């Protein structure tokens, strides 16, 4: 592989394009918000902008996260091969890529209404702050929940020009769900994080981690039900919620022994939980339109 090809491969990995799980976990609630806000028929232009925006902003988040953690990642088994930690990408190159992607994402929201633009400014600030919360709080996953739910009010604003009270049920559901699955993710790195001083809810919850994750899963379930109720959704969405319960139970089984590999499997399984909810919501709208 040529030096140029190696550099582009490093950029590709820096943006986590080789690991789309994070993009998918961001995408499902965003698409659900667009469906609920538009009563099942989102504007195609808005839909395309948000799909591209999710991919780009997830890449931005990964870059700024690796920048913040670059001196710590080399001490953690799972992260020591990341491009910044390994030296494949320089700090200047990473920050330049972050700015370019951020400006591109901002240019997308400029195609939408002023409220979306205002919300996007808050979103980019939250994205920049998040990686540093792991230094000063034991609850960075709770901050991440806000960051990863921010596309929801933006989606409502893009479709309706406002953020109605009903939008916050989906926001709350996704916040609780994010805290649950990112705590599973943090359980994978818990031993290494303790050594290097990174804080997480997996460390904070300690031996009660499984029970507290379960409580967040239950809270997410209740809020997903409320979000569907506020949108007058029917049986098919309800079946999707039941599927979410099944996935959550399976994840609890996986994390029972707190083995790294199983905790990571539980985290990955949340992609299917999100997909099932989105498909159920879409099917519910499609059936109602018959």
UniProtKB/Swiss-Prot annotation:
Query: What pathway does the UniProt record associate with this protein?
Result: Cofactor biosynthesis; ubiquinone biosynthesis
Q: State the protein's purpose.
A: Catalyzes the prenylation of para-hydroxybenzoate (PHB) with an all-trans polyprenyl group. Mediates the second step in the final reaction sequence of ubiquinone-8 (UQ-8) biosynthesis, which is the condensation of the polyisoprenoid side chain with PHB, generating the first membrane-bound Q intermediate 3-octaprenyl-4-hydroxybenzoate.
The answer to whether UniProt assigns keyword Signal to this entry is no
- Provide the cofactor list for this protein: Mg(2+)
Q: Enumerate the transmembrane spans.
A: 21-41, 44-64, 97-117, 143-163, 168-188, 211-231, 235-255, 270-290
Give the membrane topology: Multi-pass membrane protein
The protein's location, in the record's own words, is: Cell inner membrane
What does the entry give for GO biological process? ubiquinone biosynthetic process
One annotated GO molecular function is: 4-hydroxybenzoate polyprenyltransferase activity
In its UniProt entry, what is this protein called? 4-hydroxybenzoate octaprenyltransferase
Q: Which top-level group of life is the source organism from?
A: Bacteria
Main localization category: membrane
Q: What class of enzyme is it?
A: transferase
Q: Which reaction(s) are listed as its catalytic activity?
A: all-trans-octaprenyl diphosphate + 4-hydroxybenzoate = 4-hydroxy-3-(all-trans-octaprenyl)benzoate + diphosphate
What family is reported? Answer: Belongs to the UbiA prenyltransferase family.
Pfam families registered for this protein in UniProt? UbiA (PF01040)
What's in the keyword line of the UniProt record? Cell inner membrane, Cell membrane, Magnesium, Membrane, Transferase, Transmembrane, Transmembrane helix, Ubiquinone biosynthesis
Q: Which InterPro entries match?
A: HB_polyprenyltransferase-like, Prenyltransferase, UbiA_prenyltransferase, UbiA_prenylTrfase_CS, UbiA_sf
Q: Which GO terms describe its cellular component?
A: plasma membrane
Its EC number is 2.5.1.39
């Amino acid at each position: 592989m040529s030096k140029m090809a190696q550099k582009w491969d490093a950029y590709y990995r820096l943006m986590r394009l080789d690991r789309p799980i994070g993009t998918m976990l961001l995408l499902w609630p965003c698409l659900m918000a667009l469906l609920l806000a538009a009563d099942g028929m989102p504007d195609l232009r808005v839909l395309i902008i948000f799909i591209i925006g999710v991919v780009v902003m997830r890449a931005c988040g990964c870059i700024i996260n690796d920048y913040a953690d670059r001196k710590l990642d080399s001490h953690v088994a799972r992260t020591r091969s990341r491009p910044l930690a390994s030296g494949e990408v320089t700090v200047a190159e990473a920050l330049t890529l972050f700015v370019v992607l951020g400006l591109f994402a901002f240019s997308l929201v400029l195609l939408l209404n002023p409220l979306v633009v205002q919300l996007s400014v808050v979103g980019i600030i939250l994205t920049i702050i998040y990686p540093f919360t792991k230094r000063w709080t034991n609850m960075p996953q709770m901050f991440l929940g806000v960051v990863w739910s921010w596309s929801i009010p933006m989606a409502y604003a893009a479709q309706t020009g406002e953020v109605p009270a009903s939008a916050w049920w989906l926001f709350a559901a996704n916040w609780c769900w994010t805290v649950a699955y990112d705590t599973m993710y943090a359980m994978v790195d818990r031993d290494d994080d303790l050594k290097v001083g990174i804080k997480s809810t997996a460390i904070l919850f300690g031996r009660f981690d499984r029970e507290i994750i379960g409580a967040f899963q239950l809270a997410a379930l209740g809020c997903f039900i409320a979000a569907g109720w506020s949108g007058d959704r029917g049986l098919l969405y309800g079946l999707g919620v039941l599927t979410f319960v099944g996935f959550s139970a399976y994840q609890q089984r996986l994390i029972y022994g707190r083995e790294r590999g199983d905790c990571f499997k539980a985290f990955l399984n949340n992609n299917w939980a999100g997909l099932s909810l989105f498909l159920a919501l879409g099917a519910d709208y499609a059936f109602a339109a018959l």
